[in-house]
Amino acid sequence: MLDVKYLRNHFEEVKEKLLKRGEDLTNIDRFEELDKKRRELIAKAEELKNKRNEVSQQIAVLKREKKDADHLIAEMRDVGDRIKTMDDEIRQVEEELNALLLSIPNIPHESVPVGKSEEDNVEVRKWGEPRSFSFEPKPHWDIAEQLGILDFERAAKVTGSRFVFYKGLGARLERALINFMLDVHIEEFGYQEILPPYLVNRASMTGTGQLPKFEEDAFRIETDDYFLIPTAEVPVTNLHRDEILSAEDLPIYYVAYSACFRAEAGSAGRDTRGLIRQHQFNKVELVKFVKPEDSYDELEKLTNQAERILQLLGLPYRVVCLCTGDLGFSSAKTYDIEVWLPSYGTYREISSCSNFEAFQARRANIRFRREPKAKPEYVHTLNGSGLAIGRTVAAILENYQQEDGTVVIPEVLRPYMGNLEVIR
């Protein structure tokens, strides 16, 4: 959520920056109109309340002097009714203003490249060289089916499309990756592990920016108004909702493994095969709470920490800075890490690392004090995938496949798989 004071004082500047996102300005224009109306209503209501106070004193004097005050009392009843009507109108306007404020995306950081779509994203760096195959590389779903480690067909029977059974060494590879990623982030980078709930309430989804705009992408338990988490970012960020932290506690680094659930409402016909786009998938998530002045340094660190996993796995990747038109709703700046997938002949997203500045903290009311008696300030929040497990499995199967259909297990994962070297 944007700072209301900043928005009021810089409407044109905010509009200009949101236009770079390709944003429709209808909501912000409506906000400006309603905000003006609210101020006018408050001024009129205050004027009436002042009048009521003055006349109340006059009535008290008349009563003390045993004079007739009926005409003033009748007038004040009318004023009281007008004040009540006006207060109700102010309340309605404020509710609409708050709803509009929740629908306005974050302002892009000045360093974000201007563009309309992913075609305008800017490559920052590459790591590793894509492998040259002496045979035609297969897509991961064909490799997995031949090895009997993933079963999409039975998952479709049991549940529906975009689900999968991991079997045997496939399940073991998934579990090995989860433990490996957690160990690296905890032992090498000092993250604290969190195992979060998979169901959250509406306030939590609103706090991180999934609601109200993206409700159609979420799985909702209607009886209790709970939501299945689309990412561990939601429960972990909301861990400190409505709290005031101490500056001494910052930065806070959390790492969480969880299943993630997404309706993928706008993805019909895209990535219909394989592990790239599933309704349920596992992910290791990195979440940071930091001082505002540190957040962009922390974004670089966060991205490097996610990259470290791919480097240890020996998987070629590139880092791209998302342009304004491809930026997520809550993000001020995002780096996507894209892993090389031979069957696609291109890089595909495996991690997204974002700085939300105070956008989420303002929605979730997460603050800190620099000194014990100092005025609370909003923290800056960041998060990134460290990494998406299913897409990492896909990348390993494709990049480490052999001509005979077997798959070599990356060396760093072998201790997690009983020192097994090959999936056959």
Swiss-Prot record:
Xref: InterPro entries: aa-tRNA-synt_IIb (IPR002314), aa-tRNA-synth_II (IPR006195), aa-tRNA-synth_II/BPL/LPL (IPR045864), Ser-tRNA-ligase_type_1 (IPR002317), Ser-tRNA-synth_1_N (IPR015866), SerRS_1_N_sf (IPR042103), SerRS_core (IPR033729), tRNA-bd_arm (IPR010978)
PROSITE patterns from the UniProt entry: AA_TRNA_LIGASE_II
User: Which GO biological-process labels does this protein carry?
Assistant: selenocysteine biosynthetic process; seryl-tRNA aminoacylation
Q: Please name the pathway.
A: Aminoacyl-tRNA biosynthesis; selenocysteinyl-tRNA(Sec) biosynthesis; L-seryl-tRNA(Sec) from L-serine and tRNA(Sec): step 1/1
What main location does UniProt list?
cytoplasm
Catalyses which reaction? tRNA(Ser) + L-serine + ATP = L-seryl-tRNA(Ser) + AMP + diphosphate + H(+); tRNA(Sec) + L-serine + ATP = L-seryl-tRNA(Sec) + AMP + diphosphate + H(+)
Q: Where does ATP bind?
A: R262, A263, E264, E349, I350, S351, S352
Q: What is a single cellular component term in the Gene Ontology annotation?
A: cytoplasm
Residues binding L-serine, per UniProt: T231, A232, E233, E285, S385
Question: Annotated Gene Ontology MF terms?
Answer: ATP binding; catalytic activity, acting on a protein; serine-tRNA ligase activity; transferase activity
**Localization:** Cytoplasm
EC annotation from Swiss-Prot or TrEMBL: 6.1.1.11
Q: Where is the signal peptide?
A: none
Functionally, this protein is described as follows: Catalyzes the attachment of serine to tRNA(Ser). Is also able to aminoacylate tRNA(Sec) with serine, to form the misacylated tRNA L-seryl-tRNA(Sec), which will be further converted into selenocysteinyl-tRNA(Sec).
Which family does the similarity line name?
Belongs to the class-II aminoacyl-tRNA synthetase family. Type-1 seryl-tRNA synthetase subfamily.
Can you state the subunit structure given in the record?
Answer: Homodimer. The tRNA molecule binds across the dimer.
Q: What is this protein called?
A: Serine--tRNA ligase
Q: Which organism is it from?
A: Geobacillus sp. (strain WCH70)
Lineage, uppermost ranks:
Bacteria, Bacillati, Bacillota, Bacilli, Bacillales
- Gene it is expressed from: serS
